[in-house]
């Protein structure tokens, strides 16, 4: 319930638009496209590395493990550990299924279609991050 409520609040406020703009800019950057409004606007508003995917993997792990284990600190720690490993680990077979759920969740609850002003902010933020990376020799 809490995730749905939080998602609706995010989706119905400018936060959802900025979140989508961030994803769209990251997708353009990941594809080595020039960061222009036109290029960014054509990108999907879901991203593979969004924290929503981590939350979905943790919730799914908790749902399964709570059927086997009783509520305890161990259950929560194990849930977080497995959820994180699914998010960042290899192989990605199980993750691909979770990713579908995560992307749908991102699209329906945690992002909304951004306007150009949201895209401009995200593009400028990415450009500044890129400048800092170059300045630090990365």
Functional labels for PLM-detected ranges:
Residues 68-71, 89-100, 108-112:
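Membrane interface segments of multi-pass transport proteins and intramembrane proteases
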Residues 47, 51-59, 63-66, 91, ...:
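Hydrophobic alpha-helical transmembrane segments and adjacent short intramembrane/lumenal linkers
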Residues 58-84:
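Juxtamembrane "helix exit" motif at the C-terminal ends of alpha-helical transmembrane segments
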